[in-house]
Amino acid sequence: MMDEKELYEKWMRTVEMLKAEGIIRSKEVERAFLKYPRYLFVEDKYKKYAHIDEPLPIPAGQTVSAPHMVAIMLEIANLKPGMNILEVGTGSGWNAALISEIVKTDVYTIERIPELVEFAKRNLERAGVKNVHVILGDGSKGFPPKAPYDVIIVTAGAPKIPEPLIEQLKIGGKLIIPVGSYHLWQELLEVRKTKDGIKIKNHGGVAFVPLIGEYGWKE
Protein backbone atom coordinates (compact mmCIF):
# COMPACT_ATOMS: atom_id res chain seq x y z
CA MET A 1 0.00 0.00 0.00
CA MET A 2 1.17 3.55 -0.70
CA ASP A 3 2.32 5.52 2.31
CA GLU A 4 0.54 8.68 3.45
CA LYS A 5 3.15 10.98 1.86
CA GLU A 6 2.78 9.35 -1.54
CA LEU A 7 -1.03 9.37 -1.28
CA TYR A 8 -1.00 13.07 -0.42
CA GLU A 9 1.42 13.99 -3.23
CA LYS A 10 -0.83 12.27 -5.77
CA TRP A 11 -3.85 14.01 -4.26
CA MET A 12 -2.16 17.43 -4.52
CA ARG A 13 -1.61 16.77 -8.22
CA THR A 14 -5.32 15.99 -8.62
CA VAL A 15 -6.20 19.30 -6.93
CA GLU A 16 -3.76 21.16 -9.21
CA MET A 17 -5.35 19.48 -12.26
CA LEU A 18 -8.87 20.48 -11.13
CA LYS A 19 -7.64 24.07 -10.68
CA ALA A 20 -5.99 24.09 -14.12
CA GLU A 21 -9.24 22.83 -15.67
CA GLY A 22 -11.18 25.65 -13.99
CA ILE A 23 -13.24 23.20 -11.91
CA ILE A 24 -11.84 24.31 -8.54
CA ARG A 25 -12.12 28.10 -8.74
CA SER A 26 -12.29 29.31 -5.15
CA LYS A 27 -9.67 29.32 -2.42
CA GLU A 28 -12.29 27.89 -0.02
CA VAL A 29 -12.90 24.74 -2.09
CA GLU A 30 -9.17 24.32 -2.74
CA ARG A 31 -8.39 24.59 0.98
CA ALA A 32 -11.07 22.05 1.86
CA PHE A 33 -9.78 19.58 -0.76
CA LEU A 34 -6.24 19.89 0.57
CA LYS A 35 -7.33 19.47 4.19
CA TYR A 36 -9.52 16.41 3.59
CA PRO A 37 -8.17 14.25 0.74
CA ARG A 38 -10.53 11.63 -0.63
CA TYR A 39 -8.27 8.72 0.44
CA LEU A 40 -9.27 9.38 4.06
CA PHE A 41 -12.85 8.40 3.17
CA VAL A 42 -12.47 5.10 1.29
CA GLU A 43 -11.59 1.58 2.35
CA ASP A 44 -7.87 0.69 2.46
CA LYS A 45 -8.02 -1.33 -0.76
CA TYR A 46 -9.19 1.76 -2.70
CA LYS A 47 -6.83 4.35 -1.18
CA LYS A 48 -4.33 4.00 -4.01
CA TYR A 49 -7.04 4.96 -6.53
CA ALA A 50 -8.45 7.89 -4.55
CA HIS A 51 -6.56 10.52 -6.57
CA ILE A 52 -8.06 9.28 -9.87
CA ASP A 53 -10.87 11.54 -11.05
CA GLU A 54 -13.56 8.85 -11.09
CA PRO A 55 -16.18 7.55 -8.63
CA LEU A 56 -15.00 4.79 -6.27
CA PRO A 57 -16.96 2.00 -4.54
CA ILE A 58 -17.90 2.34 -0.88
CA PRO A 59 -19.83 -0.21 1.23
CA ALA A 60 -23.48 -1.18 0.58
CA GLY A 61 -23.09 -1.00 -3.21
CA GLN A 62 -22.81 2.81 -3.19
CA THR A 63 -20.12 5.14 -4.54
CA VAL A 64 -18.13 8.19 -3.53
CA SER A 65 -18.34 10.76 -6.34
CA ALA A 66 -15.45 11.73 -8.60
CA PRO A 67 -13.43 14.69 -7.28
CA HIS A 68 -14.46 16.94 -10.20
CA MET A 69 -18.17 16.33 -9.48
CA VAL A 70 -17.81 17.14 -5.79
CA ALA A 71 -15.87 20.31 -6.65
CA ILE A 72 -18.49 21.42 -9.21
CA MET A 73 -21.30 21.07 -6.66
CA LEU A 74 -19.35 22.90 -3.96
CA GLU A 75 -18.52 25.77 -6.32
CA ILE A 76 -22.20 26.07 -7.32
CA ALA A 77 -23.12 26.05 -3.61
CA ASN A 78 -20.87 29.09 -2.97
CA LEU A 79 -20.69 28.25 0.73
CA LYS A 80 -19.74 30.86 3.32
CA PRO A 81 -18.74 30.58 6.99
CA GLY A 82 -21.72 30.30 9.34
CA MET A 83 -24.17 28.97 6.74
CA ASN A 84 -26.66 26.29 7.81
CA ILE A 85 -26.16 23.33 5.47
CA LEU A 86 -27.97 20.02 4.96
CA GLU A 87 -26.43 17.25 2.88
CA VAL A 88 -28.68 14.44 1.66
CA GLY A 89 -26.73 11.21 1.06
CA THR A 90 -23.76 11.06 3.44
CA GLY A 91 -22.09 8.10 1.74
CA SER A 92 -18.44 8.07 2.85
CA GLY A 93 -18.65 11.37 4.74
CA TRP A 94 -16.11 13.05 2.42
CA ASN A 95 -18.41 15.74 1.02
CA ALA A 96 -19.70 16.60 4.51
CA ALA A 97 -16.10 17.01 5.71
CA LEU A 98 -15.36 19.39 2.83
CA ILE A 99 -18.53 21.39 3.56
CA SER A 100 -17.66 21.59 7.27
CA GLU A 101 -14.21 22.99 6.49
CA ILE A 102 -15.78 25.83 4.48
CA VAL A 103 -18.74 26.75 6.70
CA LYS A 104 -16.81 26.29 9.98
CA THR A 105 -19.99 25.39 11.85
CA ASP A 106 -22.25 22.37 12.41
CA VAL A 107 -23.19 20.46 9.24
CA TYR A 108 -26.13 18.03 9.11
CA THR A 109 -25.99 15.08 6.76
CA ILE A 110 -28.61 12.37 6.38
CA GLU A 111 -28.11 8.79 5.14
CA ARG A 112 -30.67 6.00 4.78
CA ILE A 113 -28.23 3.04 4.91
CA PRO A 114 -27.14 2.14 8.49
CA GLU A 115 -23.86 0.59 7.29
CA LEU A 116 -22.92 3.88 5.61
CA VAL A 117 -23.88 5.94 8.66
CA GLU A 118 -21.30 3.92 10.63
CA PHE A 119 -18.74 4.02 7.78
CA ALA A 120 -19.04 7.82 7.50
CA LYS A 121 -18.86 8.34 11.27
CA ARG A 122 -15.66 6.27 11.45
CA ASN A 123 -14.10 8.15 8.52
CA LEU A 124 -15.02 11.56 9.95
CA GLU A 125 -13.67 10.65 13.38
CA ARG A 126 -10.38 9.39 11.93
CA ALA A 127 -10.04 12.54 9.81
CA GLY A 128 -10.56 14.67 12.94
CA VAL A 129 -13.84 16.24 11.79
CA LYS A 130 -15.82 17.38 14.83
CA ASN A 131 -18.69 19.47 13.42
CA VAL A 132 -20.53 16.98 11.17
CA HIS A 133 -23.69 15.30 12.47
CA VAL A 134 -24.61 12.09 10.61
CA ILE A 135 -28.30 11.21 10.86
CA LEU A 136 -29.95 7.92 9.87
CA GLY A 137 -33.11 8.65 7.90
CA ASP A 138 -34.94 9.34 4.64
CA GLY A 139 -33.09 12.30 3.16
CA SER A 140 -35.77 12.92 0.54
CA LYS A 141 -37.84 14.33 3.43
CA GLY A 142 -35.01 16.60 4.53
CA PHE A 143 -34.31 17.19 8.22
CA PRO A 144 -36.90 19.59 9.70
CA PRO A 145 -35.37 19.93 13.21
CA LYS A 146 -32.48 22.06 11.90
CA ALA A 147 -34.33 23.87 9.07
CA PRO A 148 -34.38 26.37 7.46
CA TYR A 149 -31.16 25.85 5.48
CA ASP A 150 -29.04 28.22 3.40
CA VAL A 151 -28.03 25.37 1.10
CA ILE A 152 -29.16 21.76 0.67
CA ILE A 153 -26.84 19.52 -1.36
CA VAL A 154 -28.22 16.20 -2.60
CA THR A 155 -25.72 13.54 -3.72
CA ALA A 156 -28.23 11.14 -5.33
CA GLY A 157 -30.52 11.48 -8.35
CA ALA A 158 -34.21 12.24 -7.77
CA PRO A 159 -37.17 11.69 -10.15
CA LYS A 160 -38.31 15.25 -9.38
CA ILE A 161 -37.52 18.06 -6.95
CA PRO A 162 -38.62 16.86 -3.47
CA GLU A 163 -41.13 19.36 -2.06
CA PRO A 164 -39.93 19.05 1.59
CA LEU A 165 -36.44 20.17 0.55
CA ILE A 166 -37.83 23.38 -0.97
CA GLU A 167 -39.94 23.95 2.15
CA GLN A 168 -36.83 23.61 4.34
CA LEU A 169 -34.83 26.27 2.45
CA LYS A 170 -34.54 29.86 3.61
CA ILE A 171 -35.82 32.50 1.18
CA GLY A 172 -32.77 33.13 -1.02
CA GLY A 173 -31.45 29.66 -0.18
CA LYS A 174 -30.59 27.05 -2.79
CA LEU A 175 -30.98 23.35 -3.41
CA ILE A 176 -28.37 21.55 -5.54
CA ILE A 177 -29.81 18.29 -6.81
CA PRO A 178 -29.48 15.82 -9.71
CA VAL A 179 -32.93 15.20 -11.25
CA GLY A 180 -33.72 12.71 -14.01
CA SER A 181 -33.94 9.02 -14.75
CA TYR A 182 -33.46 6.19 -12.24
CA HIS A 183 -29.95 5.33 -13.27
CA LEU A 184 -27.04 7.09 -14.84
CA TRP A 185 -28.58 10.17 -16.37
CA GLN A 186 -29.74 13.23 -14.55
CA GLU A 187 -29.38 16.98 -14.88
CA LEU A 188 -27.71 18.92 -12.11
CA LEU A 189 -30.18 21.58 -11.00
CA GLU A 190 -29.54 24.66 -8.89
CA VAL A 191 -32.92 25.56 -7.42
CA ARG A 192 -33.12 28.96 -5.77
CA LYS A 193 -36.02 29.74 -3.45
CA THR A 194 -37.46 33.23 -3.84
CA LYS A 195 -40.41 34.88 -2.12
CA ASP A 196 -42.37 34.27 -5.36
CA GLY A 197 -41.47 30.60 -5.88
CA ILE A 198 -38.37 28.91 -7.30
CA LYS A 199 -35.83 29.72 -10.02
CA ILE A 200 -34.03 26.80 -11.66
CA LYS A 201 -30.63 26.82 -13.35
CA ASN A 202 -29.52 23.69 -15.21
CA HIS A 203 -25.81 22.82 -14.92
CA GLY A 204 -25.90 19.92 -17.41
CA GLY A 205 -25.75 16.13 -17.43
CA VAL A 206 -24.52 14.06 -14.48
CA ALA A 207 -24.70 10.44 -13.31
CA PHE A 208 -25.60 9.66 -9.69
CA VAL A 209 -26.96 6.68 -7.77
CA PRO A 210 -30.74 7.00 -7.20
CA LEU A 211 -32.24 8.92 -4.28
CA ILE A 212 -34.40 6.32 -2.53
CA GLY A 213 -37.18 7.58 -0.28
CA GLU A 214 -40.70 8.87 0.09
CA TYR A 215 -39.99 11.85 -2.20
CA GLY A 216 -37.41 10.01 -4.31
CA TRP A 217 -37.45 6.64 -6.05
CA LYS A 218 -39.06 3.64 -4.42
CA GLU A 219 -36.73 0.72 -3.60
Swiss-Prot record:
EC number in record: 2.1.1.77
Active-site positions on this chain: S65
GO annotation (BP), single: protein modification process
PROSITE patterns for this protein: PCMT
The entry's keywords: Cytoplasm, Methyltransferase, S-adenosyl-L-methionine, Transferase
Subcellular location: Cytoplasm
Domain of life the protein comes from: Archaea
NCBIfam families in the cross-refs: pimt (TIGR00080), PRK00312.1 (NF001453)
Reactions mediated catalytically: [protein]-L-isoaspartate + S-adenosyl-L-methionine = [protein]-L-isoaspartate alpha-methyl ester + S-adenosyl-L-homocysteine
Major localization listed first in the record, in broad terms: cytoplasm
Name of the molecule in the record: Protein-L-isoaspartate O-methyltransferase
Gene name tied to this protein: pcm
Function: Catalyzes the methyl esterification of L-isoaspartyl residues in peptides and proteins that result from spontaneous decomposition of normal L-aspartyl and L-asparaginyl residues. It plays a role in the repair and/or degradation of damaged proteins.
Subunit structure: Monomer.
Family statement: Belongs to the methyltransferase superfamily. L-isoaspartyl/D-aspartyl protein methyltransferase family.
